[in-house]
């Protein structure tokens, strides 16, 4: 079975867009791949974090993973910082990376402009990401537009290391995630933009742990147009097209089926059906989350993941040390 790796940062805020574009995809893939799913807490500290909130968010994200249907018997679930070999391998890769290629990363350029005193971690973030991937010899990595450049760098670093020291790493291939196809969920108030937790207007963003009445209200207030035709046309009708995408994502119906279902019906009727289906899905997730969050299931899953990943990562780290000439 081919091996795949994916992870999310523990921001404390998971949107419905994150669920459809990332977590749901993990669930769909868990019978197709040997999946490594991690909480990227070391990546999170490239910007300031409150320590208590960070730890709480880590546990919350694991609980959400499980509540959304990620099966710990089919996936290896772990916390990045609980495997010290990620940092060790990252340093060895940093010494085979160049300042120029790191400083050209689009995310670094964007984020460094927003912070007067940014950390070195913001610059070397992509090398740690490369370590996360290469340490497990994964075959595939799901990526959206914002991370595609980082995966290309990981492939470059792996190829460079292999050429310099001999065959060490498998070169991973990208899987284009839902972020790049029709299931990119947009902001309910500004449907030309991706649904994002950082949006100024929170009325356009649905959160997985949000009050269900609030979610329903946001969907019923979503921006549409004056035509009153439920037709998928993202250029001319971005608002209603976004709602069609949302409805399709939770019902598994095609756009054509949805257009036929709501032919002759007004937007209010359509929005109510969208809200009903979304609330049903998120309500089920929340019910499971509330049972899991304070249970010992989380620690059992993480203990198992830590044990498995540390053994694999240790072997790769020792191999790298030997090839480089470190130690005795």
What are these regions (language model features)?
Residues 2-131, 277, 282, 286, ...:
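N-terminal Rossmann-like or analogous alpha/beta NTP/dinucleotide-binding catalytic cores
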Residues 8-10, 41-43, 139-140, 199, ...:
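Short, histidine-centered active-site or binding-site loop motifs used for metal coordination
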Residues 76-79, 142, 227:
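Short catalytic-loop micro-motif centered on adjacent basic/acidic residues
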Residues 1-2, 328:
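Short, Lys/Arg-enriched, disordered terminal segments
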Residues 18, 149, 155-328:
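Conserved nucleotide- and phosphate/pyrophosphate-binding catalytic cores
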Residues 99-103, 135-142, 248-258:
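Short helix-capping/linker segments at secondary-structure and domain boundaries
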Residues 107-161, 165, 187:
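Internal, conserved structured core segments that host functional sites
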Residues 50-51, 140-144, 168, 230:
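Short, polar/flexible loop-turn hinges at active-site or ligand-entry regions and domain interfaces
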């Amino acid at each position: 079975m081919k091996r795949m790796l994916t992870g999310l940062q523990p921001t404390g805020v998971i949107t419905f867009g994150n669920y459809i574009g990332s977590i749901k995809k993990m669930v769909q893939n868990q019978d197709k791949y040997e999946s490594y799913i991690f909480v990227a807490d070391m990546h999170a500290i490239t910007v300031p974090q409150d320590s208590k909130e960070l730890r709480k968010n880590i546990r919350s994200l694991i609980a959400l993973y499980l509540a959304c249907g990620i099966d710990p018997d089919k996936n290896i679930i772990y916390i990045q910082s609980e495997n010290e070999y990620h940092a060790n391998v990252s340093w060895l890769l940093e010494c085979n990376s160049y300042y120029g290629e790191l400083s050209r990363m689009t995310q670094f350029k964007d984020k460094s402009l927003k912070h007067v005193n940014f950390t070195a971690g913001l610059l070397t973030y992509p090398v740690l990401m490369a370590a996360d991937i290469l340490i497990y010899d994964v075959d595939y990595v799901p990526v959206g537009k914002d991370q595609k450049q980082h995966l290309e760098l990981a492939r470059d670093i792996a190829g460079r290391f292999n050429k310099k020291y001999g065959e060490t790493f498998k070169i991973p291939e990208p899987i284009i995630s839902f972020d790049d196809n029709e299931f990119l969920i947009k902001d309910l108030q500004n449907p030309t933009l991706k649904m994002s937790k950082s949006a100024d207007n929170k009325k356009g963003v649905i959160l997985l742990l949000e009050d269900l009445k609030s979610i329903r209200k946001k969907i019923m207030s979503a921006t549409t147009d004056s035509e009153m035709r439920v037709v998928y046309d993202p250029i001319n009708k971005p608002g209603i097209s976004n709602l069609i995408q949302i409805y399709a994502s939770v019902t598994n119906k095609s756009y054509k089926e949805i257009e036929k279902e709501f032919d002759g019906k007004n937007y209010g009727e359509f929005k109510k059906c969208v809200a009903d289906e979304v609330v049903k899905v998120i309500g089920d997730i929340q019910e499971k989350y509330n049972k899991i969050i304070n249970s010992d299931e989380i620690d059992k899953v993480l203990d198992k993941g830590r044990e498995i990943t540390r053994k694999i990562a240790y072997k790769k780290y020792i191999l790298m040390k030997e090839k480089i000439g470190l130690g005795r």
